[in-house]
């Protein structure tokens, strides 16, 4: 540090100041603040100076930018015996300034799709990440061979900072995938900044008189590409429509920034192909356009051209494509769905296993008196009081699991109390207090049946016009013994059910398995390698927030809005008109 120092001052909002006293001293390389006075009337504040210390935490140093990452791999090591590998890329971010910082766990940011039997895969699904210029963002790209029959095999991984990708020409990096120090393939990563628009685009395409590539017809599908400095980038590939030269495709919905990067005049290419089970697919034809042209409707019908046929005098085109629907809609919010009539249903499941202790015992987690509320009772109140107002009819299904029932058989899903449903949290609590002393606690602790029950009930009568969403609140004191079966049920529900599962851990157990079910650090997958399409589980230990019920509720329920929106989008359900 020199004898003269520069002090940067910033002013936020409408704060007024005229002078400040700052105490400065220096010991070795440490600057201590002690005594200095600055007359602010003689200080010029440059509003363009945004520089600050990147190590300062809790301060938003710059607005983050959304960056889309897309991938392809080359010459992957074949991990299978009788076929080629089925690769999938998982992207992790490790917090901290050093890749060797072992104190921080990598966080799963996203993943690509799995591509079957391919050692040179080009992935369609991208991963979007927030880019902070002022932070070092260490990324790890793990390439797995997805094994449908058991444990996935690691092909290898590649690590780099996001800043290094962004700074490369064309924002493109090619790196070596390694496993145990040996190269097992090559990965290409292309980054693209995307402008958030808050808009979705809906497209519906219909074909007419496409070329017959097979004996009597074609099996057409299409691909959408957006132009970039690195060539055309694949945005979407449609399902195949069998034996139809006049195909009508289901509507497709994109975030506008994913579709065109927020640029309405960016060139788009639509390619149509004939699918062949054996051999290469046959090119039918293509056309180029822009989002602006599609939406304005100046041209809604496009001609497919195959350049190889242009030299033929009799050639006119290879078919026509019409956009029967093309429009922008705002990205829906949680409140939009609620305002449109989406019903929220609450289910509460209570752990009745012997590990809780007899309810009459003062050390029991179920010991509950007017002067001593049990952790179960306090959890019901804290979380239930937030959720209950959203429950459309006020009826809350109350379940139990892990108790001995009729004939001495342990039930892992049963009606808790004389009625299947309670009206409001007060009745839930009243029923709990009356019934728990009469329950014969048993073992083991299993979740599968409870989740299966919630899954089946949540999907009844749900469609785009009758939107419903169920929240299953599970209160438990320990680890489960049916982990594999529970994961399988969660994975099934993640793709099919309008369901979120909230788990509150009661007591002092480690809850390591509950943390795994949460899926925040590692994407949940079942024994067959099937990966959960949505993160639908949130776990919170009660002890951490027992003196702050509001924070307990906030931590427990913070992911629900995004989980509901994620399900609705996966089903192409948009908010209904407000009543």
Curated annotation (Swiss-Prot):
Q: List residues binding Ca(2+) 1.
A: 80, 86, 145, 147
Q: Which residues bind Ca(2+) 2?
A: 80, 145, 147, 153
Any idea which GO molecular function terms this record carries?
calcium-dependent phospholipid binding; metal ion binding; protein serine/threonine kinase activity
Q: Which residues form the VWFA domain?
A: 345-552
Q: Which cofactors are reported in the record for this sequence? A: Ca(2+)
Q: Which UniProt keywords apply?
A: Calcium, Metal-binding, Repeat
| Protein name in the entry | Copine-E
The scientific name of the source species is Dictyostelium discoideum
């Amino acid at each position: 540090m020199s004898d003269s120092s520069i002090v940067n001052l910033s002013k936020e909002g409408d704060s007024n100041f005229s002078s400040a006293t700052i105490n400065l001293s220096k010991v070795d390389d440490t600057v201590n603040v002690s005594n200095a006075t600055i007359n602010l009337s003689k200080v010029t504040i440059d509003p363009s100076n945004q520089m600050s210390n990147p190590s300062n935490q809790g301060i938003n140093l710059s607005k983050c930018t959304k960056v889309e990452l897309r991938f392809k791999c080359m010459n992957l090591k074949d991990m299978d015996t009788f076929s080629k590998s089925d690769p999938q890329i998982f992207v992790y971010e490790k917090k901290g300034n050093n890749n060797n910082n072992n104190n921080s766990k990598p966080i799963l940011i996203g993943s690509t799709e799995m591509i079957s039997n391919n050692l040179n895969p080009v992935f369609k699904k991208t991963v979007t990440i927030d880019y902070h210029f002022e932070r070092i963002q260490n990324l790890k790209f793990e390439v797995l061979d997805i094994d449908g029959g058991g444990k996935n095999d690691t092909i290898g991984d590649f690590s780099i900072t996001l800043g290094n990708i962004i700074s490369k020409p064309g924002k493109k990096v090619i790196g070596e995938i390694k496993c145990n120090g040996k190269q097992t393939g090559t990965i290409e990563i292309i980054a693209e900044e995307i402008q958030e628009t808050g808009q979705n685009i809906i497209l519906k395409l219909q074909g007419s008189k496409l070329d017959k590539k097979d004996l009597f017809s074609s099996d057409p599908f299409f691909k959408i590409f957006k132009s970039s400095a690195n060539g055309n980038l694949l945005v979407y590939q449609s399902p195949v429509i069998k034996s139809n030269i006049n195909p009508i495709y289901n509507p497709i919905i994109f975030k506008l920034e994913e579709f065109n990067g927020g640029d309405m005049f960016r060139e788009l290419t639509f390619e149509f192909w004939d699918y062949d089970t054996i051999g290469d697919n046959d090119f039918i034809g293509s056309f180029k356009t822009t989002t602006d042209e599609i939406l304005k409707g100046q041209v809604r019908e496009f001609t497919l051209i195959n350049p190889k046929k242009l030299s033929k005098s009799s050639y006119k085109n290879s078919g026509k494509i019409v956009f029967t629907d093309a429009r922008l809609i705002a990205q829906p919010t949680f409140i939009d769905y609620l305002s449109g009539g989406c019903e929220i249903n609450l289910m509460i499941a209570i752990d009745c296993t012997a590990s809780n202790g007899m309810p009459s015992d003062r050390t029991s987690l179920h010991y509950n008196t007017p002067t001593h509320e049990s952790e179960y009772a306090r959890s019901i109140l804290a979380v239930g009081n937030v959720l209950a107002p959203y429950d459309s009819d006020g009826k809350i299904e109350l379940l139990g699991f892990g108790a001995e029932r009729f004939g001495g058989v342990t039930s892992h899903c049963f009606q808790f109390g004389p009625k299947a449903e309670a009206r409001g949290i007060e009745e839930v609590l009243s029923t709990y207090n009356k019934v728990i002393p009469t329950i014969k606690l048993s073992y083991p602790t299993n979740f599968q049946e409870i989740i299966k029950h919630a899954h089946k009930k949540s999907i009844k009568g749900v469609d785009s016009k009758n939107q419903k969403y169920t929240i299953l609140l599970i209160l438990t004191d320990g680890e489960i013994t049916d982990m594999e079966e529970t994961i399988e049920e969660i994975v099934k529900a993640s793709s099919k059910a309008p369901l979120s599962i909230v788990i509150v851990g009661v007591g002092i157990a480690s809850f390591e398995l509950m943390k795994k079910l949460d899926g925040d650090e590692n994407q949940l997958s079942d024994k067959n390698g099937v990966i959960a399409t949505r993160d639908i589980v949130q776990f919170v230990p009660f002890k951490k927030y027992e003196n702050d019920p509001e924070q307990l509720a906030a931590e427990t329920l913070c992911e629900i809005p995004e989980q509901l929106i994620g399900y609705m989008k996966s089903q192409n359900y948009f908010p209904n008109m407000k009543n």
